[in-house]
Every structure is written in structure tokens, then in C-alpha cells.
A protein has these predicted regions:
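Short hydrophobic beta-strand that contains or immediately precedes a catalytic carboxylate
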Residues: 474-475
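Positively charged n-region of N-terminal signal peptides that target proteins for export
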Residues: 1-7
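Formylglycine-dependent sulfatase
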Residues: 8, 12, 21-471, 481-502, ...
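Extracellular ligand-binding/catalytic regions of CAZymes and related secreted enzymes
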Residues: 519
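Residues forming the ATP-binding cleft of Hanks-type serine/threonine protein kinase domains
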Residues: 478
């Protein structure tokens, strides 16, 4: 059980103000009585690329300027999860991990180009077998037709922000990003409309499991018309690392990672938002200094991003109101999360994929009035592969042994198992595709992070053939939570790095990701591991 916050100075004070005396730890046992508890309804709301820094309950630099009162409400009436992490920070693989409770190397979805095996015994099917009426609405992004759901109405591929197409059950399925019928309106509103419509028409004799998945705030950050003037007169606070990165890297100064500045000429925000055709309008940087250009590109990016978040928060409120109006709130688990995090200018980056904190961390708030006390804060290390086992345990059904995740139901009720994980394994496979981020894997503990950038495509679908120089990064998260100082070469930390390398190999073996199928990577490991 972890009893501190990573961003102690800001987050602890904010949580103390909001949650009172309950904000200093994983709060004690729930006083709710689960005896004779009927199966809970479950609403799993997931957005796309929603950074913790863009949810006000987390107390970031954006909290006051861009509040999210409805998402915050879930936390205030339930639990705020501080240490939830993705196992492969990219849309399709993360969604597959959530459904299967497995890492990419087991579920077979390594990259955006891989098809999800819809014959697998995933969360939707298991909830059906447990007696639930099941539905998924919104972003699916797994290529193959949804299975395990009594109803689906999903976006083709990434989908559109305005007047989106949706593919409804009962009509011939067309692969991935093909097919669908147009629904007039803004996508976040439409997805909520269709989610509520299903709730109204569901089988009332069964508990329900609804996955309501939003496209926003994924790029290209097209906001609703009603939000076009939101934040116009505001100055968005900038992370210090937007301009200065200390000893972060070493690739920060090179052509890697999509940048806010023009540092990476292959993909950067400054070029995107100054060229004709950008969907939310362009900015004029003529005559500006380099720093002014970066500032302007950052302001444009984050304002558009936060405008899409505003619509999400409004629609979360609509779901909560529906539950209240229909007297369903008490016995309904409501979860809000994202498929991964997002960099909002930190280290001069946008996008996800990296093992850095802003990409690795997933927001998560959970409310279940029947069993979870309000105003809780949980600091246990939870992974996206834990979501399915947790929901299955709440549903009162068996968790398949093939799932690599573990239920954190008892953690939510204030009783963290003594053998709960204190470290996690991460791997990004889609080498150099789209945002020019090398293939890498690593280990994160409560205090440290070790990353090996191996820089090889390994014949993965969609990975680029460009080979990058292998290198290591090591961060002391307790003393350097912003990851500004790569201490891999620091003599003081060599014993810790050595121990982490051993633990990393143990995790890879346990998780069936040994690299033995990739002789070129094994050769690289033999050369660069010590």
C-alpha cells in the first residue's frame, strides 16, 4: 500500500481540500455491507488519450483553468486512482489488453495494424455468461466485429468528430474503418445519445454492462461548435520542460518523438497548426521569435485539446444524471478512464507511446455507492490488464486463469493484499511509426524507472524498418518525478540499475515476453545489457 503522492505538493493539498481526512492513503475498510448484494450494473466510460493532467481532480497545472466537474464528481463520490498504468500506450493494443486481461504478446494485438481475435473469451463474453445484458457504443478500433455484446454501435476505425458514421449490430459488418451510417451531431454527444438510448431499451430483467467509448480527445482535436470560444482569453500554463529538458533523453534533441517545436522536422505541432487545411483553423507565426512560435503552437494544441475534453465532461454528467433520474446510481459501478495518457507539451512532445509518466499513466475514477465509500484515494499500482478481472469479480463470476491481470476489488474496498505488485512491465512495439518513437520496454517501481530503447522493428505490423541506436534511460521518480535527469550513467545508482535489470528479465519470463523469438534483439541485449 503506497502512502504518498507522486506530485505531493500539489496533489496532496488539493485532495486534502476535496476529500478531507480521507486523502492521505488507501483509506481503511469500507463500511458498506456487501452481504446479499445483487450483481451491480456497470458503466465503463473510456475516452481516448485523456491525460491525467487534463482532469482537474488530479490537481495539475490545468486544474483551475479547465475544470472537469462531472469526472471529478465520480471521484468525490467514490475513489480516485492515482497509479494506474497502461501496458502498451497506444489505442488498439490497450483496448485489447483491457478486454482480455493480457499483455500484447498474449492477446496478439501488438500494434495499430493488428486485428483483434474476436473469438477469444474476452470481458464482453464473460459478462454475458454471468447474466449481463452487454453493449459497446462508440470507439471500438479493434478492426474485427465486436463479439460478446448483445448490442453494439461503433465508429468505423478512428471515426469522425462531426456527423460521425456508426456501425450498428444487425447490419453487415465491414472491416475496420469501412462502413457505417451517418449520425448528425458532434461525436461525443452522439455516443452518449446512443449509450442512453441503449440503457432505456435494455432488458430490464438483467444487470447491464455498458462500455461507452469516446473518440475525444484524440487528435486532431475538433471541438464542438459550442466550445469554439472556450479558453479564448486564457493563457494555458506551460510545463517547464516545453523549453528546457535538462538531462532528459538522450534523444530529445534529435529527430524522435512528435514535437511541439520544430525540433523534429518529420512531425511537429508548429508545422501542423500553421498550414492551410488544419481542421480547427491555423495560427500566424510570421515575425515571431522561436520561443514565441513554440508558445503559440502549444497554446493552440492544448486549447483545442481541452475544448474536446469539455464535451466529454458534459456528457459524463448526462450519464450520471440518467442514473440519478432512474434510481440506478446506488447499484451501478461507474468507471471513467482513458485508453492511455497523453503528453501535453512535456519534454516538447505531444502524443503517447513513450514510457514517460504522462503517457504511461491512465486516469481512473470509480464510483459504486453500494460498496465503496465516497472520497477515497487509492495509490496502489494498477494496470489496464487488471480491469477485466476486477469487473468479473464484482459481477460474481470466475476470472479465467489465462488473464495476466489481477482483480483490485479488495483494494477498492480498503484492503490491499500484502502481496500486491510494487513494480510493472511496459512494452511499446510499433517502432518509429507515425510519431517516430523507437521500440522499447522497461520496468517501473514506486521509486524508479528503467527503460531499454532497443530500436528494432522486429517484423511487427506497421513498424518502420528504420533502425535506431539502442540506449538506456533511468529515472529516480521520487527525486525527479518530471523525469528531467537520466541517471543511467550515474555511479551512485548502478547497484539499483543492476537489480532492476534482473527484475526486468524475471518479469519478461513470467509474462511470456522473453525476446527469444527475435535473434536480432537477443544479440543486441547481449551487447548492451551490462
Amino acid at each position: 500500500m503506497i502512502r504518498y503522492f507522486q506530485e505531493f505538493s500539489v496533489l496532496t493539498l488539493l485532495s486534502a481540500f476535496i476529500f478531507g481526512c480521507n486523502s492521505t492513503a488507501n483509506i481503511g475498510h469500507s463500511d458498506k455491507k456487501p452481504s446479499n448484494q445483487k450483481q451491480p450494473n456497470i458503466i465503463f466510460i473510456m475516452s481516448d488519450d485523456h491525460a491525467k493532467n487534463a482532469i482537474s481532480i488530479y490537481g495539475s497545472r490545468l486544474a483551475e483553468i479547465a475544470p472537469t466537474p462531472n469526472i471529478d464528481r465520480i471521484a468525490k463520490e467514490g475513489v480516485l486512482m492515482n497509479n494506474v498504468f497502461v501496458t502498451n500506450s497506444i489505442c488498439t493494443p490497450s483496448r485489447a489488453a483491457i478486454l482480455t486481461g493480457q499483455y500484447s504478446q498474449l492477446n496478439g494485438v501488438y500494434t495499430l495494424k493488428d486485428d483483434f481475435d474476436n473469438s477469444t473469451n474476452h470481458l464482453g463474453k464473460l459478462m454475458q455468461k454471468a447474466g449481463y445484458s452487454t453493449a459497446v457504443v462508440g470507439k471500438w478500433h479493434l478492426h474485427t466485429e465486436p463479439t460478446g455484446f448483445d448490442y453494439y454501435n461503433v465508429l468505423p476505425g478512428q471515426g469522425l468528430y462531426n456527423n460521425p458514421k456508426l456501425k450498428e449490430i444487425g447490419k453487415p459488418w465491414k472491416y475496420h474503418n469501412k462502413g457505417g451510417e451517418v449520425y448528425e451531431g458532434y461525436v461525443t454527444d452522439v455516443i452518449t445519445d446512443e449509450s442512453i438510448k441503449w440503457l432505456e431499451n435494455r432488458d430490464k430483467n438483467k444487470p447491464f454492462f455498458l462500455m461507452s467509448h469516446h473518440k475525444a480527445p484524440h487528435g486532431l482535436w475538433e471541438f464542438a461548435k459550442r466550445h469554439e470560444n472556450l479558453l479564448n482569453d486564457e493563457e494555458i500554463p506551460e510545463p517547464n520542460s516545453l523549453y528546457e529538458n535538462g538531462n532528459h533523453g538522450p534523444l530529445i534533441g534529435e529527430r524522435y518523438g512528435s514535437s511541439i517545436s520544430d525540433r523534429n522536422p518529420r512531425r511537429n505541432m508548429l508545422h501542423q497548426v500553421t498550414r492551410e487545411g488544419w481542421p480547427t483553423g491555423i495560427i500566424d507565426t510570421l515575425g515571431m521569435t522561436k520561443r514565441e512560435k513554440i508558445h503559440s503552437a502549444y497554446q493552440k494544441y492544448v486549447k483545442d485539446y481541452l475544448r474536446t475534453v469539455a464535451a466529454i465532461d458534459e456528457n459524463v454528467g448526462r450519464i450520471l444524471d440518467y442514473l440519478d433520474d432512474n434510481e440506478l446510481a446506488e447499484n451501478t459501478i461507474v468507471i471513467y478512464t482513458s485508453d492511455q495518457g497523453q503528453l501535453l507539451g512535456e519534454h516538447d512532445y505531444f502524443d503517447k507511446r513513450w514510457m514517460y509518466e504522462e503517457s504511461l499513466s491512465m486516469p481512473m475514477v470509480i464510483r459504486y455507492p453500494a460498496m465503496i465509500n465516497p472520497k477515497q484515494v487509492n495509490n496502489d499500482m494498477v494496470l489496464n490488464i487488471d480491469f477485466a478481472p476486477t469487473l468479473l469479480e464484482f459481477a460474481g463470476t470466475e476470472v479465467p486463469s489465462k488473464m495476466q491481470g489481477r482483480s483490485f476489488k479488495s483494494n477498492l474496498l480498503g484492503s490491499t493484499p500484502t502481496d500486491w505488485r510494487t513494480s510493472m512491465y511496459y512494452r511499446y512495439w510499433m517502432h518509429m511509426a507515425h510519431h517516430y518513437i523507437p521500440g522499447h520496454y522497461g520496468i517501473r517501481t514506486k521509486e524508479y524507472k528503467l527503460i531499454f530503447f532497443y530500436g528494432l522493428p522486429l517484423n511487427r505490423n506497421g513498424a518502420l524498418s528504420e533502425i535506431t541506436e539502442p540506449y538506456w534511460e533511468f529515472y529516480d521518480l521520487k527525486n525527479d518525478p518530471k523525469e528531467m535527469n537520466n541517471l543511467y550513467a550515474d555511479e551512485k545508482y548502478q547497484h539499483i540499475i543492476k537489480e532492476l535489470k534482473v527484475e526486468l528479465l524475471v518479469k519478461k519470463q513470467k509474462l511470456e515476453d522473453t525476446d527469444e523469438s527475435y535473434p536480432e534483439l537477443m544479440e543486441l541485449r547481449n551487447k548492451f545489457w551490462n
